[in-house]
Regions:
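A composition-biased, non-transmembrane "mature-region" signal
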Residues: 25-32, 90-92, 98-100, 139-141, ...
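Terminal, regulation- and interaction-focused segments at domain boundaries
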Residues: 10-71, 169, 173, 191-197
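Surface-exposed short loop/turn segments
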Residues: 82-135, 139
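Extracytoplasmic/secreted envelope proteins and their assembly/folding machinery
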Residues: 47, 51, 55, 128, ...
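C-terminal motif of bacterial Sec signal peptides marking the signal peptidase cleavage site
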Residues: 4-6
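A short, aromatic/hydrophobic, helix- or strand-capping loop or linear motif
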Residues: 58-94, 98
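C-terminal partner/receptor-binding element of secreted or periplasmic proteins
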Residues: 157-197
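Beta-strand/loop substructures that line and gate deep hydrophobic ligand-binding cavities in soluble
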Residues: 120-169
C-alpha cells in the first residue's frame, strides 16, 4: 500500500504556464504545490453575453461520492457483507454574480474527469469561475479548485480537497477538463449566434 501511495503522492514535474501554484509544501514525504488558479484567454471582441454563455455551458450539479469502507466479514458465518455508502456534495446555483455593464461573471461549477491508465479512476473537480471581458480579449479563470475521487472502494471517501500537483489528484486530467470547459464558454462568447443549426 505504501508503494502505491508513493506513486500517487509523487509530484507532477511540469505543468502548463497558465497554472498558478502555491508555495511548496510537504505531502507524504514529497514536496508538492497546490493549484491556486488556471487561466485561459482568447483574443477578439465579445459577441455574446458572458452570463448567458456561462449559464448555457457551466453546470454546478451535485456529485455523488461513495465507498464500501463499512464492509465486513461476519465473525461466525464468514459471510462477506458489502456495505456501500454514498452521499451527495455540492450543487446549487451556478451564477454567483453577473455585471451587465462590464460583462464580468462569477460562477460555481463542477466537471468530471478520469485519470489513471489501465484502471481509470473517476474524479470530480469543483471550482469558482471568473469570466472577464477585456479590451481585445476574454479571460476565463478557475479558482478555489478542489477535487474528489468519486468512488474509493474499501477506503473511506473523505470527499473534496484542494487540487495539487501530485499524480494521485489526476492534475493533468483535471487541467484538460477545465480547458475543455473554458473552450465551451469561450466558443459561445465568440459565436455569431446562440441558436444551433
Amino acid at each position: 500500500l505504501l508503494g502505491l501511495w508513493g506513486c500517487t503522492a509523487a509530484p507532477v514535474k511540469e505543468l502548463p504556464d497558465n497554472v498558478k501554484l502555491s508555495e511548496p509544501q510537504s505531502r507524504m514525504g514529497s514536496t508538492v504545490r497546490l493549484v491556486d488558479a488556471v487561466t485561459f484567454e482568447r483574443q477578439g471582441a465579445v459577441k455574446q453575453s458572458p452570463a448567458t454563455c456561462v449559464s448555457l455551458n457551466v453546470d454546478n450539479s451535485e456529485v455523488t461520492l461513495s465507498d464500501s469502507s463499512a464492509s465486513f466479514v461476519g465473525s461466525y458465518t464468514g459471510t462477506y457483507y458489502d456495505i456501500e455508502s454514498s452521499r451527495k456534495e455540492g450543487g446549487g446555483a451556478t451564477l454567483q454574480h453577473a455585471d451587465a455593464e462590464s460583462g464580468v461573471v462569477v460562477a460555481k461549477g463542477v466537471t468530471e474527469y478520469t485519470s489513471g491508465g489501465l484502471m481509470p479512476i473517476g474524479h470530480a473537480a469543483r471550482y469558482k469561475l471568473l469570466v472577464a471581458p477585456m479590451p481585445g480579449k476574454t479571460v476565463v479563470q478557475f479558482k478555489d479548485i478542489e477535487y474528489a475521487q468519486k468512488s474509493t472502494g474499501y477506503m473511506e471517501n473523505t470527499g473534496f480537497q484542494r487540487l495539487g500537483t501530485w499524480w494521485g489528484s489526476g492534475v493533468m486530467d483535471a487541467y484538460a477538463a477545465m480547458e475543455q470547459q473554458a473552450d465551451k464558454v469561450l466558443d459561445c462568447i465568440y459565436s455569431e449566434s446562440l441558436i444551433g443549426e
